[in-house]
Amino acid sequence: MTFSFTATVLGSPRIGPNRELKKAVESYWAGRLDAEGLDALARDLRRRTWTSLRDAGLDSVPVNTFSYYDHVLDTAAMLGALPDRVAGIESDLDRYFAAARGNDTVAPLEMTRWFDTNYHYLVPEISPTTTFALDPSKVLRELEEARALDIPARPVVVGPVTFLLLSKAVGSDAPLLDRLDELVPLYADLLGRLAGAGADWVQIDEPALVADRNPKEIAAAKRAYDRLSGLELRPAILVASYFGSLGDALPAIASTGVEGIAIDLVAGSDTLATVPDLTRKHVVAGVVDGRNIWRTDLDAALASLGTLLGSTGSLAVSTSCSLLHVPYTLDAETGIDKALRSWLAFGTEKVREVVTLGTALTSGRESVDDEFALARAAASTRNTDRRLHDATVRARLDALTASDPGRSPAAERREAQSALSLPVLPTTTIGSYPQTTQIRVARAARRKGEIDEAEYLKRMRAEVADVVALQEKLDLDVLVHGEPERNDMVQYFAEQLDGFFATDNGWVQSYGSRCVRPPILYGDVRRSNPMTVEWITYAQSLTQRPVKGMLTGPVTILAWSFVRDDQPLADSANQVALAIRDETVDLQGAGIRIVQVDEPALRELLPLRAADQPGYLDWSVGAFRLATSGVSDSTQIHTHLCYSEFGEVIEAIARLDADVTSIEAARSHMEVLDDLSAVGFDLGVGPGVYDIHSPRVPGVEEIAASLREALKAVPVERLWVNPDCGLKTRGPAEVEASLRNLVDAAKLVRAEL
């Protein structure tokens, strides 16, 4: 009989507790570290991760969750589905990174958000000529490494249904799921090899099944797992779901011969008692939240587990999803107050909670009474802490009226904004400029106490002056100050708003080597002082051209933070919106004529099921409009959106009512413009004309061709010219070359009009 484990997690972080992987990968890209050195570091990171999970008490440890860049890209490589354009690159590793990042001659794969999280994956491209072929070397190697360390290893792979549903069809309109029969034999081969290598269990992730799926898709998934579970030589199969309820897919998967099903009981609401086939399954219950950082209510979690005991064959405790989405450990946080610390659980602490619940399930709650008592005490102090309830903030929210989130009609605003006297096809950038060595040195010196605040501010003002001078030299029309003072577009504001806490080492992976430190929104939000006015007005004093005020919108601040779970998201969004509204009014009062309120994460919080989406879109649009409706008609409001499948939220983008919307569109080849046209979008739009996530410098004619394509869908008087995202992560030389070509392309197309 297959061994049934009792405590596990669905995945773990891979960047390293001190971002070791990020630094090593970037050193490899820069030529400072060779492939052997990178491999040695990766092997050590895997060893440390697996042994810490085993030693914490997990009796099944996920492996193959490590990745140099992205686990979906790893799956494409495993299935022989990297794009043809990288085939000529000799090195496997360089071919992999070229698909992820591109190079001087190769465009990268598109990137988009992983379901409704702030992690982003590379979108595989599947064409009619794609010939799938199995390369199991990575997963087999990691299994071998783990077994050599006496790790109770459970290999993890992205499932065939999810892989196809998340991929992009190229050169054909046929549904990619029609090719499932081509993939199932490869997975069958993989299962046989894993069994031969000693795997007792394999976890096959199928999170795509928690979104709305039609009967044909569910039937296809059932057929696939009927075939895989019918194999004679294979490990036990755990089909893992997360980020929501399986719904109709649950009985379909339960009716197959797979031994286990992992279910998200934090984000989902599946009623297991209604699925009789689960009485023959090993159910892995995700009762510890893998996406947020709040301490688990152990009493409630154990009660939930208790209700499942009669509905399942056997039961294990787990996180609701991979711990990829939370920081490593609270131990690295030294500046956090005692009360707030007691309310939190990062990765290490969540593993401890899983083990505690597993012990309570198998040995009785009395065996872990102390842990349960600590959890109860933390919940009690959180419920009574005065920081969570600010009477002034609550009164202001209660006083809002239906007219507060509204502005004048767009035509009236356009007339008032004509005083800006901008040319057709005005050029601008999204906001941030490269974080130069000088910026990083100054920031580190201030942190170590080697320079005082006055010297730091002096150096940052010099950076602002350099960025303004560069933009004038390049002849851009609307300028930005470059954001040298900002370490992160959300954390910068969180550090200045009451109700937030910014961690020292709470790093999580956003994509590739890009890591972020999401702040913690734990209480009511209030702005005590202006946050950006001094920086923007200084930049404006250096030029006669308009300089944009740069703010982050309320939805993005929520999406890229760990948000309190004791009140509706809409309430927290409106609190943040009022703080941003006050800042826009202050910027206008200081003479700033254009204010950009970025909402790159608008799509990320969209619920996965259609029935839940209208409510979210109502409050998210309302929060943006509340944040931007305090200014006069003559102040031009911009917003920026990125990493999004805009078709699903395109009407909401129009409802934001921003005067100009810049959109990441370079990797998706301007597809979003057709969606905008279809909903009658009649405001300014700046589709990104080149991809800043790739180090390649686009040519003038390449950018001009993108502009000509955009003009087929957008009237010239409404089209803006900009990159598709901020320039923070790029090098100064490539930024200058790219922007020079952008301006030259705009001038070229203007001359053709």
UniProtKB/Swiss-Prot annotation:
- Where is L-methionine bound in this sequence? 430-432, 483, 598
Q: Which GO terms describe its molecular function?
A: 5-methyltetrahydropteroyltriglutamate-homocysteine S-methyltransferase activity; zinc ion binding
Catalyzed chemical reaction(s) = 5-methyltetrahydropteroyltri-L-glutamate + L-homocysteine = tetrahydropteroyltri-L-glutamate + L-methionine
Residues given in the record as 5-methyltetrahydropteroyltri-L-glutamate binding sites: 19-22, 113, 514-515, 560, 604
Residues binding Zn(2+) are 640, 642, 664, 725
| Biological process according to GO | methionine biosynthetic process; methylation
Q: Which cofactor does it need?
A: Zn(2+)
* EC number in record: 2.1.1.14
Kindly give the SUPFAM superfamilies that the UniProt entry links to this protein.
UROD/MetE-like
Q: Which InterPro entries match?
A: Cbl-indep_Met_Synth_N (IPR013215), Cobalamin-indep_Met_synthase (IPR006276), Met_Synth_C/arc (IPR002629), UROD/MetE-like_sf (IPR038071)
What family does the entry list? Answer: Belongs to the vitamin-B12 independent methionine synthase family.
Protein name as it appears in the record: 5-methyltetrahydropteroyltriglutamate--homocysteine methyltransferase
Per the UniProt record, the source organism is Rhodococcus jostii (strain RHA1)
Q: What is the lineage of its organism?
A: Bacteria, Bacillati, Actinomycetota, Actinomycetes, Mycobacteriales
